[in-house]
Swiss-Prot record:
It is an enzyme of class 1 (oxidoreductase). One of its GO terms (cellular component) is cytosol. It is found in: Cytoplasm. It catalyses: UDP-N-acetyl-alpha-D-muramate + NADP(+) = UDP-N-acetyl-3-O-(1-carboxyvinyl)-alpha-D-glucosamine + NADPH + H(+). GO terms for molecular function: FAD binding; UDP-N-acetylmuramate dehydrogenase activity. PANTHER family: UDP-N-ACETYLENOLPYRUVOYLGLUCOSAMINE REDUCTASE. Its EC number is 1.3.1.98. Cell wall formation. Pathway: Cell wall biogenesis; peptidoglycan biosynthesis. One of its GO terms (biological process) is cell wall organization. Belongs to the MurB family. This is UDP-N-acetylenolpyruvoylglucosamine reductase. The keyword Manganese does not apply.
Length: 373
């Protein structure tokens, strides 16, 4: 792999025609070759690279920001310079009897961060355990699981605005978070996140364990430790256990986690569906809306374990698409399976599923049409 460390201004030869293999840098294990990869281990390196990039008109190509590769669908050939933020570090910036503020660099593994904070007695992220990827990518999707979203604990994001070559500190409000959405997702390849600030609490009795099977499993962990009620560590271990049972390890069976978003429909539409399918799974949402479990829809459409070779839904969790031809399958294989699943679900339930992972075009731009190549 061609990997340029920007400890000094980038020399032209590091942006040559030597291709970089990204097949092993995306958890879906899709075959992908890129023009060049630049690995950034601190913010100064980014400033230096951008100064060179601005001057080097001969080799200039589009920029594409790639974090842990856990939520992207890459093209077979990526005609772009790939920027990989790999800054590391965690530090406490403020602390009281009730909360602790921490700043986390973009290259920190997300799950490792969750485990670390719980071990330190800093709580709020435990429901987000075992979500793949790096911390810098978490705000892009406003990651969420088991009743918690990233925005619940996020204070700020420090990010580089690539078009203007300026640094910005964005508050949670500035990030314009929504369900699996943010300003970073809506403005792709515009921002490079270098660090994220969180405010976590220190009250070990404050837990959210009422979602799905979490309460039962967390209570089991608490009982084993001689406690009457679950603590945050119990919730974290419960969620890890549940996710490991339901979700395949990308290292063993390539996938990019939940492939489809849970659709949100009007309550009256959900009530109509419920009259025909009493077991349908839904969760009340604001503004008279209901969030429907996409995995349930896919399974009831007869697609659990189904798809189009070599991309299939997982046998234990229909929400996950898996790649049975790692490093060979392409984005077009995923597109075919995705269309088949979306069309089948719509035909049965009249609900349109939406893809969660980011669709990357050949020039590094982000596409929203599954037929874009």
């Amino acid at each position: 792999m061609t990997s340029a460390l920007c400890s000094k201004p980038i020399a032209p030869h590091t942006l040559s025609d030597d291709l970089a293999d990204l097949s092993y840098s995306n958890t879906m294990a899709l075959a992908c070759m890129a023009d060049s990869v630049v690995t950034l281990t601190d913010e100064v390196q980014l400033d230096e690279f951008m100064a060179y990039y601005e001057q080097d008109t001969q080799h200039r190509k589009p920029l594409f920001v790639l974090s842990g590769g856990s939520n992207v669908l890459l093209p077979a050939k990526l005609n772009a310079i790939v920027l990989r933020p790999q800054m590391r570090g965690i530090q406490v910036t403020a602390q009281t009897d009730f909360h602790v503020d921490i700043e986390v660099m973009a290259g920190e593994n997300w799950h490792d961060l969750v485990v670390h904070t719980v071990a330190q007695g800093w709580y709020g992220l435990e429901n987000l355990a075992l979500i793949p990827g790096l911390t810098g990518a978490a705000p892009i999707q406003n990651i969420g699981a088991y009743g918690v979203q990233l925005e619940d604990c996020l204070q700020y994001v420090r990010a580089y605005h690539l078009p203007s070559q300026t640094w910005h500190d964005l508050t949670a409000v500035d990030c314009e978070f929504g369900y699996r959405d943010s300003i970073f997702k809506r403005q792709p390849n515009t921002w490079l996140i270098s660090r994220v600030g969180f405010r976590l609490h220190t009250d070990a009795t404050k837990v959210l364990a009422s979602y799905g099977d979490v309460q039962t499993v967390a209570q089991s962990y608490a009982t084993q430790q001689g406690r009457t009620k679950p603590m945050p560590a119990d919730v974290m271990h419960a969620i890890i256990e549940i996710r490991q049972q339901k979700l395949p390890d990308p290292k063993q069976l390539p996938n990019c986690g939940s492939f489809f978003q849970n659709p949100i429909v009007p309550q009256d539409q959900f009530a109509t569906l419920q009259s025909s399918y009493p077991a349908i799974v839904g969760y009340p949402m604001p503004d008279a809306m209901t969030k429907v479990a996409a995995g349930w829809l896919i399974e009831q459409a007869g697609l659990k374990g189904g798809g189009i070779e070599p991309i299939f839904t997982h046998q234990q969790q229909a929400l996950v698409l898996t790649n049975h031809a790692p490093y060979i399958a392409t984005k077009q294989d995923v597109a075919a399976a995705q269309k088949y699943i979306i069309d089948t679900v719509y035909k049965k339930f009249a609900i349109q599923l939406s893809r969660e992972p980011v669709w990357v075009n050949a020039d590094g731009s982000i596409g929203y049409d599954e037929h874009v190549v």
